[in-house]
Design a protein with these regions (language model features):
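Activation targets extended, charge/polar-rich intrinsically disordered C-terminal tails
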Residues: 140-184, 189-496
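Soluble extramembrane regions of membrane proteins in the secretory/endomembrane system
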Residues: 58, 62, 68-70, 75-79, ...
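Sec/Tat signal peptide C-region and signal peptidase I cleavage site
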Residues: 39-45
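Short His-Asn-centered micro-motif
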Residues: 51-52, 72, 207-210
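Bacterial N-terminal signal peptides
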Residues: 25-39
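Short, surface-exposed beta-edge/turn micro-motifs
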Residues: 46, 66-67
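N-terminal secretory signal peptides that target proteins for export/translocation
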Residues: 1-23
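N-terminal post-signal-peptidase region of extra-cytosolic proteins
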Residues: 49-58
Length: 496
């Protein structure tokens, strides 16, 4: 779902107002206060660490350590290798280091716009709703042409999947991530800009002593000395992404004036393999069968030590931190127009952002009931295999704004379906294919565990889009409108 993180606005963090019999009379004043708090004025800045989930590739397949990057709300990319302060309305940036960025020069780091990092597009309204490598590669090529002129001229950079600049484009298509954010100052940002713009950008990546987590740790400690550190015991002397996220979070909790917020970006449903939870070193030894079994056989005497080390000092659950300090990635204008704004204002906003288990269960039951009642429709029948069929038979393309399309051959002709938030219900998008796509997407979201799905506020918008798609598909088929076209009231519960 969209993120509009203006450099002049904080992420929205909820707190539960006191309930009272006069809440109806206080609602207008409360909404004015809420919207004023969300207004695009801000005098300070933010920095955050991004904990990226683990991919089943390379050394990550063994270590399960994932990846780490750093987020700035007031620092933007002048080029992928140069900082500047953001202009009003810009959404900040993400900076990261890799083993091999793969560009003409061996750079240590690149910096990209936040929404490009998350979705592969500048405006999140054009974010993809369907994850496939065809779409991701099309977004990568668009990014290369628009941003890497003069930096990516070699055949290896342009065509090799080993060039890791690609991981900084539409990352949510390949992995989920958590963003831990605190307040900083513009003065701190200016100092960092001067430091990095004047320092050599030379790659010295080393997995043991100078990896992505070391890189983020040093940047965070520039803002807040000793805020992030390695876990020598649980990561065997190295720095892991999870250790940096854990120590940074604990530091922020000891300093409430930093206003800790946590955001969760779920991996986009589709045909790309699901990413995995990030793990510390001892945690991976205990949870990975391919490591635990050999250890139990050949080094069984060390197993109790490893278990005790992890249980006592190494545990950290990003999802629980999100539930404690949730921030929404919905922009103020989306909140203001949301039919759920009143309930967000008057109920526990943490529950409203994360979603109560009872509310999710009610949506699952409603979805299953409606699918059963419409089981004869082709869209309902195809939903379990739709992603695979769309990926296998479709040809991906992206427009100048990054909005993605899939074109399929049909009866000697072709038909197109929009696979971005901005075009899935467009006039040019086939209504029945669009409905099938949103059915498959909704089904995947509702089947996902809580650490694999988006927020409840975002899902409310998903449900509204599904209703519109249902009505459009029913009109195209010309039968009676689908029962999914009505809004199903869901009562929230405070139980997770």
């Amino acid at each position: 779902m969209p993120i509009s993180v203006s450099n002049r606005r904080r992420f929205t963090l909820g707190h539960a107002p006191d309930a009272s019999p006069s809440r109806a009379s206080l609602l207008p004043l409360f909404l004015v206060t809420l919207l004023f708090a969300l207004a695009p004025f801000r005098a300070s800045a933010d920095v955050g660490v991004i904990l990226n989930e683990s991919l089943d590739e390379s050394m990550d397949r063994i270590t399960g350590s994932g990846h780490m990057a750093v987020y700035f709300s007031r620092i933007c990319a002048d080029t992928p290798t140069k900082f500047r302060l953001c202009a009003p309305g810009e959404s900040g940036s993400v900076m990261s280091t890799y083993i091999n960025i793969g560009e003409n020069h061996s750079f240590q780091w690149n910096i990209v716009p936040l929404n490009v990092y998350l979705y592969g597009v500048e405006d999140p309204v054009n974010r993809p709703l369907f994850a496939s490598y065809k779409i991701k590669h099309a977004l990568e090529e668009r990014y290369r042409q628009n941003y890497l002129a003069g930096l990516c001229d070699t055949p290896a950079c342009q065509t090799s999947n080993k060039s890791e600049w690609r991981e900084m484009v539409a990352s949510t298509l390949i992995r989920g991530m958590y963003l831990f954010i605190v307040d900083t100052s513009v003065e701190q940002d200016r100092a960092l800009i001067v430091e990095f713009n004047n320092a050599p950008n030379e790659n010295h990546f080393n997995g043991a002593t100078n990896n992505c987590a070391d890189f983020v740790r040093r940047i965070v400690n520039t803002y807040f000395p000793h805020a992030a550190s390695r876990d020598v015991l649980n990561d065997f002397g190295m720095t892991s992404p999870k250790a940096v996220a854990r120590t940074f979070t604990h530091y922020a909790q000891r300093h409430p004036e930093l206003n800790l917020r946590v955001m969760h970006f779920a991996q986009v449903p589709g045909t790309i393999k699901r990413s995995r939870d990030v793990r510390a070193g001892t945690e991976q030894l205990l949870r990975s069968k391919k490591l635990l079994i050999p250890m139990a056989v050949f080094a069984y005497e060390a197993l109790p030590v490893v278990a005790a080390s992890y249980v006592i000092t190494g545990r950290f659950n990003p999802e629980k931190e999100f539930e404690k300090h949730p921030a929404t990635n919905l922009a103020p204008e989306n909140l203001a127009s949301s039919p759920h704004l009143q309930s967000v204002a008057l109920q526990d906003q943490r529950t409203q952002i994360v979603g109560a288990s009872a509310e999710w269960n009610n949506y699952r039951k409603a979805f299953d009931t409606e699918i059963e009642e419409n089981r004869d429709s082709p869209e309902a029948l195809d939903r379990s295999h739709f992603f695979k069929l769309l990926d296998e038979k479709g040809t991906a393309s992206v427009g100048s704004d990054g909005s993605a399309w899939m074109q399929l051959s049909e009866n000697g002709g072709s038909v197109s379906v929009g696979v971005s938030a901005s075009n899935v219900l467009a006039q040019e998008s086939d209504p029945q294919l669009a409905y099938s796509l949103l059915l498959a997407r909704t089904s995947a979201l509702l089947k996902s565990p809580k650490h694999r799905r988006e927020t409840m506020l975002e899902f409310h918008q998903e449900w509204a889009n599904l209703q519109r798609a249902s009505a459009a598909a029913a009109s195209a088929r010309n039968p009676a409108p689908s029962k999914l076209a009505r809004l199903i009231p869901i009562e929230a519960s405070a139980t997770f």
